[in-house]
Regions:
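Active-site microenvironment for binding and transforming phosphate-containing groups
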Residues: 1-185
Length: 185
């Protein structure tokens, strides 16, 4: 997967793993449950990928969540990024969409997923922040465009999206069946 030209460069992937959403249920800590699945909260700048049945939950404003799912293996993951791309920023973390999606693809690959079996769902990107100086584009719009671009270049079909607008969203994505629930706030 590392040499697949359809995917973002793995060199953008950070070496640290402290951006992982903590799965409290895996450590035996009591946790909320959604439709029989332990809930894992994915905070801004975090991501998760798992072979376990989990309900990944997050809140989105201008941020975007890219959810990927492999239906054959019934595994999936979610990113929650704040800004579209790192643009050479020295702090290369999944707060940036280009890094977040590349790391999620890499982690899912390590769990056995294959890019040709993946399906994507994209959420968020509301217009709740001011425009970028100079180009007049809004953060949410740029986040949406980046998600569509990366997923499109990887030839991963987008099976659902709820993006844009002027309201935030509460999102729950089930990693074992690829289903998602969205509520606008």
């Amino acid at each position: 997967m590392g040499n697949d030209p359809r995917l973002p460069s793995p060199s953008a992937s950070p070496a640290r793993a402290d951006f992982w959403a903590r799965d409290r249920a895996a450590s035996g800590v009591p946790t909320p449950v959604f439709r029989g699945r332990p809930v894992v909260y994915v905070a801004p700048g975090e991501l998760m990928a798992t072979t376990l049945a989990r309900a990944a939950r997050t809140l989105l404003g201008s941020c975007v969540a890219v959810c990927l799912w492999d239906g054959n293996l019934r595994i999936g993951g979610m990113t929650h990024y704040l800004l579209p791309d790192s643009n050479g920023h020295p702090d290369v973390t999944p707060r940036y969409g280009d890094v977040a999606v590349a790391v999620l693809l890499e982690r899912l690959h390590r769990l056995g997923a294959r890019v040709e079996r993946l399906e994507a769902k994209i959420f968020g990107g509301a217009r709740v922040l001011p425009v970028f100086p100079g180009d007049g584009a809004r953060v949410g719009d740029k986040n949406i465009a980046l998600a569509r671009d990366i997923v499109g270049r990887a030839r991963i079909p987008i099976r659902g999206e709820d993006v844009g607008g002027d309201r935030g969203r509460k999102l729950i994505f089930c990693t074992d069946d690829g289903s998602a629930w969205v509520r606008r706030l």
